[in-house]
Amino acid sequence: MWLFRLELKRILKSRRTLILLAIALLLSVAMAYLPISFEGINRPNKDGTVTELNGLAAIKYKQDLYKTSAGEVTPDRIKSALETYQSCVREYGPVEEEGFPLAVFIEKIVPFRHLLMGLPETFADPLTGIGADLMDIDPNDIDGAYYEKCAEHLQDVMRNEQRENETAQQKALEKYSELDTPFYLHSGISKDAFDYIEFYILFLAILCVAIAASTFAGEYQTGGDSILRTTKYGHKQLAITKILAAFTLFVVTFLVGITVHILILDAAFGTDCLKTSFQMRYSIINLPNINLGQLQIILVAAGLLSVLATVSCTLFLSAKCKDTLTVLLISIVVLLMPLFAYVAMGATWLSTILPSAGIGMQNNFLSQLADFNYLNIGGMSFWTPHVILISAGIELFVFTFLAIHSYCRHQVA
């Protein structure tokens, strides 16, 4: 234990480490503020004027509007909302046009528009997947079989996207059949809030990699390794201690930073909206059987696993290479490779099995949860979020073992 404390103290004495940790905490606050600042709405006043609300004021005003639509998403409520929408459009014209009265939009459209979110998808063209216009949907077609119709749309989507893989189609339908219905809606929190959780995890991963790069390679450069090698605990035990100290620092930093980040978001947007079903914030045919509060927990857990897997790869490179700069450059390439692979080739094994596969932008874990990507091998199909988690878990242990092994072999050499 004393060796562990000494190693942790050594890491924290580095000015570079302290600066990077401070940046991590500052980013936690700054990146939580951004999606809050993006919120905006125009409020009509009794005297006919309009007040533009932004930030917390806009969020509070929207929360008051959304209260009337909170609850279970039943076919009857969707039908009623659609009838109201169509009635307003027939009387005042398209909602998107400038001539649509703001007072009517705020009173009759805004509170219920999220109830209508899934209708264009549900009634989409089965061949092209193009969503239906809300004015073309007959309210009488929204009946007790609404959720069965959603499942039919998922079947059409999977048939188009996984045409040659019936196993993937079947697995998606089976997963969708396990969802708890009717869905629940309490509007309030934006997609941006969840996107910025993922962005923050990406920046945390970069900062952790920057700190971890010098764990072993830094001592190779200074020659300190030659001195430590002559001590009683300068072999395997020292390698394990260094890795444990690094992991402890990164876990604490990650949890503190992400907790502060999420607490700021939840304080601003409220916690009632976290009861909303995943499908009511993203796509009506999404597969995860979770609400937005559970989504936050899953993103944190998956992000921590991916960060640790990426750091373990960096520690292996640090034990293998002779200078910190080389380690850092290779580690950054490995960290960003899934992002570029996904942009270039879409969902492939390369973009999902690397340690940082769940970290990034289009390729991040949230995007995979909201998508319908399946990887196929032989007659088997695997949903990409499962592949990412399993791969990261395996790589965490494999790269940690390789880091210890490489450090010991370096000593023998």
Predicted feature descriptions by range:
Residues 17, 306-314, 371-413:
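Alpha-helical transmembrane segments of multi-pass membrane transporters/translocases
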Residues 229-235:
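Short helix-to-coil transition segments within interhelical loops
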Residues 33-34, 321-357:
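Transmembrane helix segments
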Residues 230, 314-335, 408-413:
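Cytoplasmic juxtamembrane regions at transmembrane-helix boundaries
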Residues 21-24, 242, 331:
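Residue-level recognition of transmembrane alpha-helices
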Residues 26-89, 138-219, 240-320, 364-365, ...:
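Secretory targeting signals
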Residues 1-18:
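Aromatic- and glycine-rich beta-strand/loop motifs that create alpha-glucan
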Residues 349-373:
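Short hydrophobic, aromatic-rich alpha-helical segments embedded in or entering the lipid bilayer
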